[in-house]
Each structure stands twice: as structure tokens, then as C-alpha cells.
Amino acid sequence: MTSTKFETKPLFTRQQLTALLLPLIAEQALSVTIGLADTLMVSSVGEAAVSGVSLVDTFNTLMIQIMTALATGGAVVASQYIGHREEKSARAAAAQIMFIMSSFSVLVAAVVVVGRHAILRGIFGSIDADVMKYAETYFLLSALSYPFIGLYNAGAALFRAQGNSKISMMSSLVMNVVNIGGNAILIFGFKMGVMGAALASLVSRAVACCAVLFLLQKPGCMLRVTGLSAMKPDGKLIRRILRVGIPAGIENGMFQIGKLSVASLTSTLGTAAIAANAVANTTSTFLNIPAIAVGMAVLTVVGQCLGAGEKEQAVWYARRLLLVAYCGAWVMNLSAFFFADRWALSWFSLSPEASAMALEVMMWFNIVSLFFWPSSFTLPNILRAAGDASFTMTVSIVSMWVFRVGFCYLWVLKMGGGLLSIWMGMYLDWAFRSICFMVRFVRGKWLEQKVI
């Protein structure tokens, strides 16, 4: 990517972009693969235990998404300061995101520890006593891990902002290996069940968090956070971070709530549809790995370009990286459509009815993803890197409630649609988002935003 002529020196070489992207792809592949293995190990505990863990993980996912969004705000601000050659301000932004994340995660953890029973009752209503018992146990230990998750996410985002994605990849590897090893020992060795699974997650997150914090304090780190003294609140920097982080957090939070609404609708379609939907969700996650990795990379690349005042380079790299995301989507989805979908289904013990539904949904996913997934999910990160987070939030929330939720309920409850109707509502959501984001990108409105 160095062949294009700019008026100034290109900020990124092809080798630098490759070095940024490949670890991110490996990190995502690792996370998805080991996450599946983790789910299978926990499922050996029993149906009530799995139900309890599943309920809590719904809330955990919401919290992780919000913390990831806050970390994104810090990464965008730090990236732009790096591009502007203001390393002192970049380090100050790094310290502020650590302050924001630690404060938020400790507050949420305290609320959950004290009120976990009321929270579970309030969200999920009346559930069986044995499921509630397992859920409360898992919720307690999950809450204790929130500060570790938050600080790990912030630290990993800061390393990516520097263009160093190897650190987050290796930290993720360590975290997942410790988690799987802990599950094996505590669940199968000591027969600790849900408590063992929760302890393994807590320890793995603590280890990864400590590793990232240690590396952030090394003298050679550009975004070095020297200690608590550096984390003194700075209102100006906090506002800049939250200007990106809050809209992204609201967007992610609403997205999870929308998914819950659709999940409850899926449950009305019967056991076969529930099983088919679960399998389709699991397998489709693998197909998004390259585009997700590109979406993480553009925060660094576009952020640094705009921080340096190089709008021309920001647009050029954004287009090339979006093309890379599309190439990844085409390779993964065409391979799945012609070869892998049926093979993947053979890994699951599904009834013929559920297998047929899952295959239909998966093949439609392959087709629609070719055109809409990268522009619906990778492209908005380009806009966020410029500070255009309020626009992406507005579009995403409107699209989700109108298409992903509204159309799904209309088609299923009023028109008698099945599982494919629910997924078609999701595809309409993608199409609408893609059109809005592409128009915003082409018109250049996103380049008018100011972060620093």
C-alpha cells in the first residue's frame, strides 16, 4: 500500500498494515474457537447449570460490550494524538481511559455483588430455584472479574492504538488457555461445576489484566501509564473520550437488548428452531473473523491519519481496508456456501428438521454477507475513528428497532413467519445500515468531525 502518491509520506507501509492485521485475525479466531470449547466444557455440568450460566452471560456480554465501547473512545483519542505527534497528550489520554474504565467497572461490580438476586429477578423474572442458585454463584464471581475485564480491554485497545496488535493477541492467548485449563481442572478434576467455571474465568481475566498493565508500564511503551498518580481526572480529556465512548456504548447496549428481544421471539418457534438458530449463530461467527479484525485495525489507521491532519490518506487507507474486509468476507462465505456449511452441521446432533432450518439460514447468511456485512459493521468503525460516533449510534439504534426487532415481530407474530423470517429482518437491518454508512462515507461528512 505504498505505491500510491501522497503529497506527504505515507503513514503506513504494507508491512505495517500486515503486521497489524494478522495478529488481530489470529486473536479473533482464537477467541471464537476457544469460546466454543469453553461452552462445550461448561455444558457437561448439567442443564440447570448451563441455563444459569447462559442467563448471566447475557448480562456479562452487555457489560463487556459497554466496556469495549469505552475502550474504543480511548483508543480513538490516543490514536489521533499519536498521529499528531503529541505523545505526552497520548499518554495522558491513556491514563484517563484507565481511570474511566476502573471507575466504571468497580461501580458496576459493586452494584452486582450487592444486588445480584434482584437484578436476576428483574431481568429474567421467575426462574427455577436450581437455575437461580447456579446463576447467583456465577454472577457473583463474574462481577468480581469486571474490573479485570475493563482494564484488560482498555490496555489492549491502547496497544492497538500504537499499531501493536501482537500484545493483545498474546494476552488473549494466555487468558483463553488459562480459562480452558482452569475449566478442565476445576470442572472435571475437582467437580466444582459452575463455581469452577466462574473461578477459571475470574483467574484468567486477572492474569491477562495484570500482564497488560505490566507491559503498559514498561519504559519503552509509547502510551506508558506510570501509576495511579497519572490517572488524576482530567475533565477535558474525559469529555473527548466519552464523546466517542458513550454513543458507542449506548449503541452496543441497545444492540444487545435488541438481540434479547429477538431471542425471546425465536423461543416461540419451537425446539427445532431454537437449536437451528443456536447452531447458525455459532457457525456464522467464524465467517466474520477477517472483517471484525479489519474493523479493529481501522480505528488505529484512520485515527492516526486524521490526527496527523492527513484526510486524503485516511480516506485512501479506509477504502483499501474496507476492500480487504470484503475480500475476507467473500473468501469465507463462498467457501462456507459451497463446502463448509453441511460439514459444520455434522458436528451437531440436530434433528432433520432443525438441520434443514439451520442450513437454509446459513446459506442465506453466506449470500447476504457478501454484500452487506463489511459495510454494516466494518465501515462504522471508520466513522468512529473520526469521532462520528453519534451518527453511527443513531443509525444503528433506529435500524435495529425498525428492522431487526419490528419487522421480525411483524413477520412472525402477524404473518406466521418462521426462523428464516427472523434472519431476514436482520438482513434488512444490515442493508439499511450499509446504505446510511456508505452515503455518510462517500459524502465525507465524517471527515468534518473533531476529536482533539
Spell out what each predicted region is.
Residues 1-24, 78-145, 189-246, 302-368, ...:
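Short alpha-helical transmembrane segments in multi-pass integral membrane proteins
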Residues 8-40, 44-45, 61-73, 77, ...:
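N-terminal transmembrane alpha-helices
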Residues 19-35, 141, 175, 204-208, ...:
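Transmembrane helical elements of multi-pass membrane transporters/channels
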Residues 29-51, 120-129, 185-192, 253-286, ...:
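Helix-terminus/linker motif at the lipid-water interface of multi-pass membrane proteins
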Residues 47-58, 135, 139, 198, ...:
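Small-residue hotspots at the loop-to-helix junctions and early N-terminal turns
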Residues 50-110, 149-168, 274-340, 373-395:
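Small-residue-rich hydrophobic transmembrane alpha-helices
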Residues 62-65, 179-183, 209-213, 286-289, ...:
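Hydrophobic transmembrane alpha-helices of multi-pass small-molecule transporters
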Residues 71, 141-160, 168-176, 197-212, ...:
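Short runs within selected transmembrane alpha-helices of multi-pass transporters and secretion channels
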